[in-house]
Amino acid sequence: GIPQSADNPPWDGGFTWTKDKDNRDWIAVSCEGEGARIWWPNKDHITAEGDSVRMTYTVPSNLVAIGNGKLKNIKNMGEKTSYEWFVSNPINNYNISVQIGNYVSVQDTLIKDNQTHFMNHYVLDYNKELASNFFPQSKEVIRFYEKYFGDYQWYEDGYKLVEVPYLGMEHQSAVTYGNGFSIYNGVRSKSWPMYGV
């Protein structure tokens, strides 16, 4: 089939098909309003949560596919590569997302109660240095929210921010972020959900 395109993401659901500044494919899905049925078959009801989800995305080998949860396997098949992601916690279908692009990982850790939690953020390769200086602020935001609202619920599935070509959305364990690496604008507008906490 032909996947639905998003006219005004993330408010209008579907895929965003675009190019990055180096004219390479950059793809992301948002489906919070319409539901996940617009891009994959499922029992799409707000009360229906899978107790876990395993998703495999196969993309051209020059691209990387980022999903919710933890990366379990990468299988290179020559011209294509498959990325297997696994969410071990219950998740609403509309929170499941995929982002595809020339991503690199910016890794960090959060120490809490003598446990190390990994934070693997994914950004376009030419934004790695900028993101490396920006994303450490997400630890401060998580600590703030945990102080007032309780623990982050999905440490087992990790925490990541994924750069996208729209403003972003709070997908469980794979928060999409398109705010141009400017936390101060978000703080002023009280738009902290970009951190998904």
Each model region followed by its residue ranges:
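Juxtacatalytic substrate-recognition/specificity segment
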Residues: 55, 84, 104-197
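Extended, low-hydrophobicity, Ser/Thr/Pro/Gly-biased non-transmembrane segments
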Residues: 1-103, 107
